[in-house]
């Protein structure tokens, strides 16, 4: 019986490189490689055993062989056998190559060229070192980005929940968006902890199911985040375009779209993976057709948001050019335009640029998707909460009540409303005395 195979020369260093950073379609973990290696070994030994049992008498030549890397079939003397690189090496290098052995009267010759050279496992390639260093820096950047975003989003979500006067449909949608960014950051940290933890092969089988569940949760959080970005775009577009827009009725539909539709697609993906591609931890998407179950809806949501972005800019430009928009109306539309220009590009429009990107643009794509994308939650929290005039007013009043022991001032807050394509301004006294009005009911941003 052959001994349990260990990773060949160069595999450990390659796995260290693979675990340097989280990537979309990242290199596999050591456990994934060992699972594939064990599957190939078991399959080879079964085929060799069936071949041995089917022979009535020994055949002269070279017997079938498992050399801990490849499965060599029986061969007659004087022949050269060619095999493609084993699957576990192709998982690491994404390159095809061939291995050769000669069958002589004395048996098999050594494999040539060496598997690490034939299959692209070059340990002296300086480009691997540069890429390794780049991925390490990238991992540090997106870890800082997700951490800072997580802190700011938690604070922003707490503020919107704490002040009842800020409770309205618009801010309810913002809360859901903040929560989706929080889940995205947390799922990324959990996934990194599972995928890039100590990969002791003894514990591979014990963590296999849990690792898949983590990947399902991670994919759900990613899709939910894109779904709520789409909801933000649909909501803003509806306020500008639809004459009679019932916000409360649409909120229920938005909740179903934001949390329900990702669950449907991720469940379909998980079931498909289980039956058609149940290999590894489900972090490698070798089957493009299965991966498009998730990738397709995400790209579609990005495309829809981009179309909404263009139409919103068209509407705002038309309103800004009309003669009726003057004074405070003009300032309001400029504020709306600035917020839109800052927010909509953050919806992930840059993904469209990299959908069919060439292989040489991978580093640029990773920088946009991971390094800059990890700060997306921070920017959204600042834009939707900390720079919001209504939020600042409520926090200022509460600060004065708690620390200055003085009655808060009574500033006049200007708000606007849209009705039948026209705009109007309303002034609201923000005093604690008397009946207070909801300061966010008629505001768009």
From Swiss-Prot:
This is Secretin receptor. Glycans are attached at residues 68, 96, 102, 124. Belongs to the G-protein coupled receptor 2 family. One of its GO terms (cellular component) is basolateral plasma membrane. The lineage of its organism: Eukaryota, Metazoa, Chordata, Craniata, Vertebrata. GO terms for biological process: adenylate cyclase-activating G protein-coupled receptor signaling pathway; cell surface receptor signaling pathway; diet induced thermogenesis; intracellular water homeostasis; regulation of appetite; regulation of synaptic plasticity; response to nutrient levels. It comes from the Eukaryota. Keywords: Cell membrane, Disulfide bond, G-protein coupled receptor, Glycoprotein, Membrane, Phosphoprotein, Receptor, Signal, Transducer, Transmembrane, Transmembrane helix. It comes from Oryctolagus cuniculus (Rabbit). GO terms for molecular function: G protein-coupled peptide receptor activity; peptide hormone binding; secretin receptor activity. Pfam families: 7tm_2 (PF00002), HRM (PF02793). Residues 22-137, 192-212, 273-287, 353-363 are extracellular. It is a multi-pass membrane protein.
